[in-house]
Amino acid sequence: DSGNIIVTSIDGTSANLEIRKDAHSDFYQWFHFRVSGARGQRITLRITNCGGSAYPGGWDNYKARFSDDREDWRCADTSYEDGVLTITHTPALDSIWFAYFAPFSIERHHDLVQRTAACPDVELIELGQSIEGQPIDCLRIGNGPTQVWLYARQHPGESMAEWWMEGALELLTDPVSETARILREKCTLHIIP
């Protein structure tokens, strides 16, 4: 549900790629794609348009993520030079995934919202829909006077923020956490995961 790459050329075990622009935007930064049929072969993936991305300074010392099962993500050998991000890897299996950061699937997102909304004293409000027709949900937790807004994934490439949000929601809805109890008493939290 979050694939994003353009293959511009393939030569043996090397490929030149480009990151596709975000929908209805001139910006781009994130990628997520699968490579098949390269088990045991050292592959070189060159993303050639990184120099024109939304935040080219973010590629210095950056490491792409890879996974053989889409559950466990590790850092790939990655370098950035002259606007080109180069990923080199030798897959152990026939199918391997690469991503900007560990993806947070839309199914996992919906599960998180549903699980949190089922907790006591949590109100689910649908604020609207995304341009893809997905609900934009807000989870209201607590009843204190201080209004706190937390939101994740404002931009397409920000999947890492929802991993943080998952942990925050687990803490904030924990019935035995003293920290969560105090926050719920002092604040009304409006959370858009």
Q: Where are these predicted regions, by residue range?
A:
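M14 metallocarboxypeptidase catalytic domain recognition
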Residues: 1-193
